[in-house]
Amino acid sequence: MLSVIIFFPAISAILGFLIENKSIKFYGASIALIELLLAIFICVNVDFQGYDFVLTHQVSLIPSLNISYFVGIDTISLVLIVLSAFMSFISIAALSDDGNLKHLVISVLFLESTMMGVFSALDMILFYSFWELSLIPLLYIIGAFGSKNRIYAAIKFFIYTFLGSVFMLVAIIFIGYLCYQKSGVFSFNLLDWYKLGIGENAQIWLFLAFFFAFGVKTPLFPFHTWLPYAHGQAPTIGSVLLASVLLKMGTYGFVRFSLPLFPDASLLLSGFVCVIAIIMIIYAALVAYAQSDMKQVIAYSSISHMGVIMLGIFSLNLIGLGGSIFLMISHGIVSSALFLLVGIIYERAHTKEICEFGGLAKVMPKYALIFFIATLASIGLPLTIGFVGEFLSLLGVFKLNKLFALLGGFSIIVGAVYMLVLYKRVFFGECKEKNLSLKDLNFKELAALVPLCLLIIALGIAPNLILKPLEPSVQNIISKMQTRAVNSGTKDKISSLNGGSKL
């Protein structure tokens, strides 16, 4: 079943070359919808209780090196798989009907397969393969369908992410060799790695190697410079997929690999990572406030929110870690809605400059309402999806360091300011004469945006729909950190951070 979810979009993408251009959007949306229904089927029918991973499937690929096709999921993987499937469907459904869409739709389906592989792989060589393969379709989407400087943006994106991944590959090979030294056989099986005792000094170097790969993808300061440029040049569908899922590959890597594999290093360097995250939050918020382009505001807002996610992850406790994963889902939904909205107004007005608008609420009331809902979620208003993840992430980091929580909370206030100022400048005041003829949202656009708005409200009111299923898997990560730590002080600190914690 899991292998079907991983490879169904890729196989369908290959078959898509046989489909006529006029039918390709319907074909792609149908494939993405089937993929989403398969993911929901797993949510409803698979019991995750009492298991580290379910739906595991293993086939030996290179026996001499013990490399295998080994996949399996827990609820952390599952929520990201559902998010990937949902946003792939929304992205294709929201495409304009004009132009040659065949290669764009095929690229999205290939990208969806690689994302499913990243969130399911339990063999590290397999994980690395899916990780690197995800670069190819997104590189093509930006380079072939982006704006004027799309080639430069695509190359910059590729160089940053590829070079970061090289460090991870070296670390993967080294840990495989450690297994050979201790047992006489190479192993890239994550479950074997969880049982491997790694000294504290080695953990630090290995943590840093993974940190470069995941930090570039997240992206952490100062590795973030590729992201605003990629967003600025990418087509709307590229920005949606980049913000909703691709960035989560980095934060997922920290949760799945860095914390449980290198618990002593994670605790030792948690302060360092949190300081970087706070710099990232404040810096991105201030830069966002200074932007004149709507899409760039959303891009820097995205960086700021990823910083809050990093604070939650490196709080090293159940509350913060659970909140960070919830915030991954929240950010994926909210940022996607905002990028879709910016893409819609760009199609009509052929500009994203904030100064070119004003008073749009009068001529586009439906557009203004949905943008308002997404803005409220972005600033973390209670009863929206944006509040829960931010609150839990900051509550978690408060247990680690009160100053980090205070600075993180202050930066969120700055974020509220720039988003509200953006909304005021675009939707209130006098409407320019050239914008009086702009058309409000049509049925197709509403069909893509309304589900996102419903999720923003529903999961803000009932966050336990995600939090409760997540709790056992998050607790499992914490337990692995405690049992695998080689330093007794690390065990005690993690235990004290998690005393009596529940999601």
Model-derived features: positions:
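Residue-level signature of transmembrane alpha-helical entry/exit and packing/kink sites
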Residues: 1-6, 25, 81, 104, ...
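Hydrophobic alpha-helical transmembrane segments
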Residues: 68-84, 197-215, 406-412, 492-497, ...
